[in-house]
Amino acid sequence: MRSSDGQEAGRPAAILIAGPTASGKSALGLRIARAFGGTVINTDSMQVYADLRVLSARPTADEEAEAPHRLYGSVDGAVNFSVGHFQRQAAVILSEMAPDQLPVFVGGTGLYFRSLEDGISDLPEVPEPIRQQIRAEAEGRPTEALHATLTLRDPKTAQRLRPSDRMRVMRALEIFAATGRSIGSFQETRLPGPLAGRPLLKVFLSPEREILRRRIDARFVTMMENGALDEVAALRDRRLDPLLPVMRAHGVPGLIAHLDGALSREEAVQRGQGDTRRYAKRQFTWFRHQMGEAWHWTTPEAAWSLAEALLSAPVGQ
């Protein structure tokens, strides 16, 4: 899709590279950063975690040495890293960059990209003791029962949440316990996005579906060869809350089931591949319906050519 807002007309203030998993985003981001003095900023909710270098397909140490990389492997798995955390850290990174440095945001998490321009709701931080208390009370209870509890405490929020949406129900309960207020009352106020109103080049890498499917399957096998199982074994040994994002990363539940003897290695690999393929499909759907016309749906090579033309043009053209 071509931009209708004239963003091609001048040098972009930042490059945004999105797309499904295994579409070539990281390689393109590094290529642009090397060529134009850029800093690659992670925009993927799993690649932030230190525990998942292999299974999240983070750039290698050698790749990270070729250009500055930020927000990769910088968060401990025990942290429930949110869109709010991402937006605040991205804003700090942008404020620290020199004027001639090019921010290159790379990842597959749509809400992260949206927060850069549209901002996010100004939700309060939940103190860890309260979070742990709510999770302890929820342990062993079905999600529908938690939703019933939310209905008693915050009926308006409960009405708009699916009774089966455990994560959002839990989040609403945590906010209410911490503040005594509905999560909806905080969502009425938004923090501005750090890239709002700035000229951007936004590309979504869109491989053919069958090619992408083969890449996903092959990459999971390669991850297993490169130590993904050992990585997950170390994560399992930490005995973290199973609701934490790091514990629900694609591949983690199946590999833990294999380590526990519930699945064979082959079954765990197939489950990880299938989960990742379904996630890629959801990424296509989400971006198509949520991110508007200002994104170029394209290939890595075409995206490189577009970026090269814009970034090489004399200032003012």
From Swiss-Prot:
Keywords, in A-Z order: ATP-binding, Magnesium, Nucleotide-binding, Transferase, tRNA processing
Bilayer-crossing regions: none
Gene that encodes the chain: miaA
Annotated organism of origin: Methylorubrum populi (strain ATCC BAA-705 / NCIMB 13946 / BJ001) (Methylobacterium populi)
UniProt-listed Pfam families: IPPT
NCBIfam families according to UniProt: miaA
Subunit structure: Monomer.
Record-linked Gene3D superfamilies: 1.10.20.140, P-loop containing nucleotide triphosphate hydrolases
Substrates-to-products reaction catalysed: adenosine(37) in tRNA + dimethylallyl diphosphate = N(6)-dimethylallyladenosine(37) in tRNA + diphosphate
GO molecular function: ATP binding; tRNA dimethylallyltransferase activity
Enzyme Commission number: 2.5.1.75
Protein name from the UniProt record: tRNA dimethylallyltransferase
